[in-house]
C-alpha cells in the first residue's frame, strides 16, 4: 500500500543499502493546520499561558515516549484479571496506577480475542495515544492508511502480514481529538512461564495499534 513502508533492520553494522528518496521537511507544503497550530501557540505564549520554553519541553517529553509504557499496561492485564477490567474501563486511570501520565484526553482500550480483531485509525489526521505507545509511525499518518483502513481493513491488515480468518470480526476504531484508542493484543501462546517484565518486552507498537498480532513462542 502506498504510504506503508516495511523496514525491518537496524543501521548499526548494517550492510550498504538504499532508501527511497524522502522530501526535505522544508519542501513539504505549509498546511492550514500548521498555520493554525503556529498561530494558536504564538497567541498563548503572548498571553503568557505558557512560555516558549515550556512548550518546547512538553514537545520533548512527548517525543521521548516509547511503546514501553503501553507494554507495561498490556503485560499487567495479561496476568491480573482485576487490572484488565480496570484497563478496559478507564485506560487513563489504569495508567496512573503505574505513575504513567496518559494525558488529559480519554483513552479507550479494546481487546483482541479469538473472535474479534481490533484496529485503530484516525481518519482526519493522526490522533493517537502518544504518551503510551510513542510517536505515530509515518504510515499511520498517511492518507492511504487513513482512508483504506475504514473501507477495506482486511486488505490493509494483509499488507502488514496479518491474515484475519473469515470467521473473525474486524472492528475499526476511529480515534478523534476527544477520544483515543489502544488495542489489548492477545497474549502469545507459549509465554505462560514468562514473568510480567518479560511479557512487557513482547508487546509492540503495531500490536497496540492492531495492524499486527504478537507471534506465538
How would you describe each model-predicted region?
Residues 2-217:
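Terminal, compositionally biased segments used for targeting/anchoring and flexible tails
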Amino acid at each position: 500500500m502506498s504510504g506503508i513502508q516495511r523496514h525491518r533492520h537496524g543501521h548499526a553494522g548494517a550492510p550498504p543499502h538504499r532508501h527511497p528518496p524522502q522530501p526535505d521537511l522544508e519542501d513539504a507544503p505549509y498546511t492550514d493546520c500548521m498555520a493554525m497550530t503556529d498561530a494558536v501557540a504564538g497567541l498563548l505564549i503572548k498571553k503568557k499561558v505558557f512560555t516558549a520554553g515550556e512548550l518546547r519541553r512538553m514537545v520533548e517529553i512527548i517525543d521521548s515516549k516509547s511503546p514501553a509504557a503501553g507494554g507495561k499496561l498490556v503485560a499487567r492485564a495479561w496476568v491480573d484479571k482485576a487490572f484488565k477490567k480496570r484497563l478496559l474501563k478507564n485506560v487513563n486511570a489504569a495508567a496512573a496506577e503505574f505513575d504513567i501520565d496518559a494525558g488529559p484526553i480519554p483513552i479507550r482500550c479494546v481487546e483482541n480475542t479469538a473472535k474479534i480483531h481490533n484496529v485503530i485509525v484516525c481518519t482526519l489526521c493522526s490522533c493517537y495515544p502518544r504518551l503510551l505507545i510513542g510517536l505515530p509511525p509515518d504510515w499511520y499518518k498517511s492518507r492511504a492508511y487513513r482512508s483504506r483502513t475504514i473501507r477495506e481493513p482486511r486488505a490493509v491488515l494483509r499488507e502488514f502480514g496479518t491474515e484475519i480468518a473469515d470467521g473473525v470480526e474486524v472492528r475499526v476504531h476511529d480515534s478523534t481529538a476527544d477520544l483515543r484508542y489502544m488495542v489489548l493484543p492477545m497474549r502469545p501462546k507459549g509465554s505462560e512461564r514468562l514473568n510480567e517484565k518479560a511479557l512487557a518486552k513482547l508487546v509492540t507498537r503495531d500490536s497496540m495499534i492492531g495492524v499486527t498480532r504478537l507471534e506465538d513462542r
